[in-house]
Amino acid sequence: MRGVSVCFTRTQLMRMFPAVLSCALTLLAGLAQAQQPMPATPSAQAGSQMQAATPSQVPVAFAAAPLPGGSTRAATLRELGIDYEITLRGVQGSAGVPFSVRSDEIVTAATLNLKYSYSPSLLPDLSHLKVTINGVTVATLPTDKANAGKLLSADLPIDPRLVTDYNQLNLQLIGHYTRDCEDPDHSSLWANVDAATSLSLTTTPLALANNLALLPVPFFDMRDTRRLELPFYFPQRPDTATLQAAGTVASWFGSLAGYRGAVFPASTEALPASGNAVVFATPGTLPAQFATADSGVADIRGPTVAVLANPNDRNGKLLLVLGRNSEDLQRAATALALRAPLTGAVARIGDISAPAPRRPYDAPSWVSSERPVRFGDLVTQPSQLNVAGYHPDLIRIGLQLPPDLFVWKRDGIPVALNYRYTLPEQDNKSALNVSINESFLTTLPLTGRPFAQSTPMRWWNSLGTRGSMPVHQDLTLPVGAFSANSQLRFHFFFDRPQGEACKNTFPDVSGAIDADSTIDLSGFHHYMAMPNLAAFANAGYPFTRLADLSESTIVLPDNPGDQDLSNVLTLLGHFGASTGYPALHAQIIGAGAVQQHAGRDLLLLGSAESQPLFKQWRAHLPIGQDGQATRFALTDWLFERLPRFLSFDARRTDLPTTAEIALQPQPDDVLLMGFESPLKSGRSVVAFQTEDPANMSRLFDAWFDPTLLKDFQGSVVLLQQNNVTSLVGNQTYYVGHLPLPTWLRWYFSHHPVWLAFTVVLLALLLALAARVLLRRRTAERLNDGGGA
């Protein structure tokens, strides 16, 4: 086994000490067996084809036993961000899988459960699969003929000393199919890595200092790709103002969690027995464990933020948000959410400059609709826009669009694309493929000139200099391919040049999307038919129209319990994940104060008994208590007496209506409803109705599952067990604004009979006006003639 020389800093050595000690003990225990061959690692069968493969060059000492108190978790490739099956092609095809380790953990054992298959054409004595961690080889897997084409499984122990904070797991195929001259890109040179491949890490906690400068660590760690679960503790039942402060903090953590999702279990009984948590307290409610002078927080004289050890768990931390009253709590929460500079274990909050009021649709996570947006502003690292090699990965750009873009009579969304690439020596099949999510858009040949479909434009482009970089291309992205969270994908395909026999050296190739490329939504208005629960589930709309939720109010049920508090915090975290900004101005009230919030969008929680507004607004709900639809009298009259295309209802028609399905809600069901606010037209209400607030956790799970999230549509969603049923109600209203000429064109295009009626009416009015005018002129002429 070849030695590896590695240099470490003092901090790294301290982090690795438990792992080094564990490996040393295991090595001593294994010396007696050093001369014996390593047994094949047992592996689970995958159908009838899954077999266990024995890797070579895997040191036995690396398979260290977990330390006491350690925890083990496994993550599949999908959970690590690879949502597709990896295919390795060519003589040296490779693929990388990044993974990271939390700041408050150290790895004591690691195992890669690799599920793979390879081509039957590979020569066993010249070919193998190589697995590396951060550039260090940890295993090589043979490609014997007996197992070729089968789905194999191998458990590969990894030396935990190789695992750092940020890591790169690399899989490489060294493949050859002949001993003579070979095509390095031959179709028989392949190996597949199954998406079920998983990485298992055993970790032990690492003590961190009580230092606010580390925030949001350890309460949220960007290196952790799992869903964030952060408990909130209130020493007594919080009032609405205290809950608003907690909501600000929850929405901040939700904005940090982003795609991971976040849930916030709430408790008013006791501090969490283990792990990290957030605590809200005033002098009268401060837990006894922190009432001593040495805690540093016993004397609360104003807004205060502190990080202290969890008295129930030496490895856990508590984030304390303290104040003399609820106003102080809100100031402390705002300081946290706005990332005010904090250091030490305890920080007293002084004056905080109020942030500027948010404008509609200016959420940091949304593509701005006020100006063209650079691609460089839509990625976290400039390197994400660059690729190299003949089998490059996709360039992915996330696009979170406002859900109410008015795209009627528009060809699509304009993109000014600038891209660079290694120019082929001669014209070939090299191309840049563009797609949105899974929908193919276009192919741009890599000829050194912009692509044009019309003959005159191709002739014009041919007059330009070939190979001038960057190449500029105007694209129009069809709006039908977009979802609330879309991905614009670019794939550079480089065609290998035809070389001479046995001369297979090819030039290095690379491609890049210029960071100054732009997408422009500034020409679109905002106007949408409501209710639209797809927009709510995916983007929190209409509440997130203003990123700070300054026009949104959450209405609690009577006597809310811990689970109700948790649901409120999780919803605000969901809104923060959508906007990328904390909900600084969301209001939380009881049903009795709803009249004072008539001009705001409302979010209702509770059961038919605990939420009084469900009874007060029964006539306005899209579905009644008996499961039947409710309509306004005028709408009934129109549906009964006029053709459907004359109706004001321009909703989508591919969903069943609430009148067409007899619902029989069960106690475990969750009913999600959207309707226009009875208090003010143009304002929206979204209501969650369930007998047990704990059922809401299943709805949140559905939101985090893309296969279920897409089923949230229409104005009513019924969650029964794990089934999502979407219905469309019979009331439609519109939010947003259109210029009058645009609104008239849109309205009459959807209601041709009303257009005809309006034209006839205008013709009659013009005829009447002309008749009156002509009679007046005739009378004047007769009067003039009589006077003569």
Swiss-Prot record:
Pfam families: BcsB
InterPro entries named among the record's database cross-references: Cell_synth_B (IPR003920), Cell_synthase_bac (IPR018513)
Cellular localization per UniProt: Cell inner membrane
Residue ranges crossing the lipid bilayer per the database entry: 753-773
CC annotations in GO: plasma membrane
Periplasmic side: 35-752
Segment forming the signal sequence: 1-34
Topology Cytoplasmic: residue spans: 774-788
Topology of the protein relative to the lipid bilayer: Single-pass type I membrane protein
GO biological process, one term: cellulose biosynthetic process
Keywords in alphabetical order: c-di-GMP, Cell inner membrane, Cell membrane, Cellulose biosynthesis, Membrane, Signal, Transmembrane, Transmembrane helix
Domain of life: Bacteria
Pathway where it operates: Glycan metabolism; bacterial cellulose biosynthesis
Gene3D superfamilies in alphabetical order: Galactose-binding domain-like
Function: Binds the cellulose synthase activator, bis-(3'-5') cyclic diguanylic acid (c-di-GMP).
Family: Belongs to the AcsB/BcsB family.
Quaternary structure, from the entry: Tightly associated with the cellulose synthase catalytic subunit.
Protein name as catalogued: Cyclic di-GMP-binding protein
Source lineage: Bacteria, Pseudomonadati, Pseudomonadota, Gammaproteobacteria, Lysobacterales
